[in-house]
From Swiss-Prot:
Mutant lacking the gene: phenotype: Reduced lignin content, late heading time, semi-dwarf and flexible culm.
Cofactor note: Binds 2 Zn(2+) ions per subunit.
Physiological role: Involved in lignin biosynthesis. May catalyze the final step specific for the production of lignin monomers, like coniferyl alcohol, sinapyl alcohol and 4-coumaryl alcohol.
Gene label: CAD7
Class in the EC hierarchy, top level: oxidoreductase
The protein's name: Cinnamyl alcohol dehydrogenase 7
Length: 379
């Protein structure tokens, strides 16, 4: 049995108005990023809300950036986590899509304005009125949001997605709540742009830059689409992993000039998941005329854009951030049908700080998931 973490000695936070539901979480209180138990409050279940018992929560690299205040936007205490899966415990009177006992997930956002053009078009992840993120954000009622490193969340039904479950009696395939949790961020971050930009057509050739939390899921989706997929990495040691275990068709070491030259002009598209600053010129050279490269990573330094390579080849360089709720639900259903899930290391709540240290060193294959339901205790 996994070890447990309790909140017996944790400080009680003064609940905002209408935030009367008690919950327990793991919070960072300063830029050391060290997580300790804390008692927090959640709002009572509103008419359009879904209350969820959190069972699992994935650890995203953005969680690490935030708890350490590396983006200079942390408001402590921070209860991180936006790859949340669990079971519905209560629904509001206006909620018809969910019921108690349903297996569900919550991703990176929990509210938007609902009225701007992006929201009306079903692209709420680009809400011009401001996305309310699952944690370290300010909700419409002025309260701070706390994420999935906690035993319970209350979320508007608009931002909850259903997980196919064998317990539901349906004929379709189920998606595990533990290895499915990272899909709510890493999964939709690559799935949405692949679908939007036509990098989902069987027989076409797609490159995946980076073989980490996002990249390994991109490889799995590309294979499920029936595409030819080549991994592009700075790490030669990942060749065997990419080809033999993940089933990629090819592997290129990006610092190997001969390998890069041999692949020039062969790809219909590239999903670039790397966060390190990279050479756009060498990657664009891999594309066929009118090929597309989609950036989903956030480099630390501004990129140098080779305009002649873009214009001369009619190539497209685009960015993508997360995915909409409809895209997230579509992705979850597709993943269940095709057996796509993240490769995870399941950890107990008392192992989170060690996991963060390992994540900072890149020592994870490929995603940590916290077993909240079995290891985070309130007594």
């Amino acid at each position: 049995m996994a070890p447990t973490t309790t909140a017996t000695a944790a400080a009680e936070q003064a609940p905002p108005p209408q935030h009367t539901r008690k919950a327990v979480g793991l919070a960072a209180h300063d830029d050391s990023g060290h997580l300790t138990p804390i008692r927090i409050s959640r709002r009572k279940t509103g008419d359009d809300d879904v209350a969820i018992k959190v069972l699992y929560c994935g650890i995203c690299h953005s969680d690490l950036h935030t708890i350490k205040n590396e983006w200079r936007n942390a408001v402590y205490p921070v209860v991180a986590g936006h790859e949340i899966t669990g079971v519905v415990t209560e629904v509001g009177k206006n909620v018809a899509r969910f019921k108690a006992g349903d297996e569900v997930g919550v991703g990176c956002m929990v509210n938007t304005c609902g009225g701007c053009e992006s929201c009306r078009d079903g692209c709420e992840n680009y809400c011009s009125g401001g996305v309310v993120f699952t944690y370290n954000s300010v909700d419409r009622d002025g309260t701070r949001t706390y994420g999935g490193y906690s035993d319970a969340v209350v979320v508007s039904q608009r931002f909850v997605v259903r997980f196919p479950s064998s317990a539901g009696g349906g004929a379709g395939a189920a998606l595990p709540l533990d290895s499915g949790a990272p899909l709510l961020c890493a999964g939709v971050t690559v799935y949405a742009p692949m679908r939007q930009h036509g990098l989902c057509e069987a027989g076409k050739h797609v490159g995946v830059v980076g073989l980490g939390g996002l990249g390994h899921v991109a490889v799995k989706f590309a294979r499920a689409f029936g595409m030819r997929v080549t991994v592009i990495s700075t790490s030669p040691v990942k060749r065997q992993e990419a080809l033999e275990r993940l089933g990629a068709d090819g592997f290129i070491v990006s610092t190997n000039a001969s390998e890069m030259k041999a692949a020039m002009g062969t790809m219909h598209g590239i999903i670039n998941t790397a966060s390190a600053s990279t050479s756009m010129h060498s990657y664009l050279a891999l594309l066929k005329p009118k090929g597309k490269m989609i950036l989903v990573g956030l480099p630390e330094k501004p990129l140098q854009i080779p305009t002649f390579a873009l214009v001369g080849g009619g190539k497209i360089l685009a960015g993508s951030c997360m995915g909409s709720i409809s895209e997230t639900q579509e992705m979850i259903d597709f993943a269940a049908e095709h057996g796509v899930a993240a490769d995870i290391e399941l950890i107990g709540a008392d192992e989170v700080n060690t996991a963060m240290e390992r994540l900072a060193k890149g020592d994870v294959r490929y995603r940590f998931v916290v077993d909240i339901g079995n290891t985070l205790r309130s007594d």
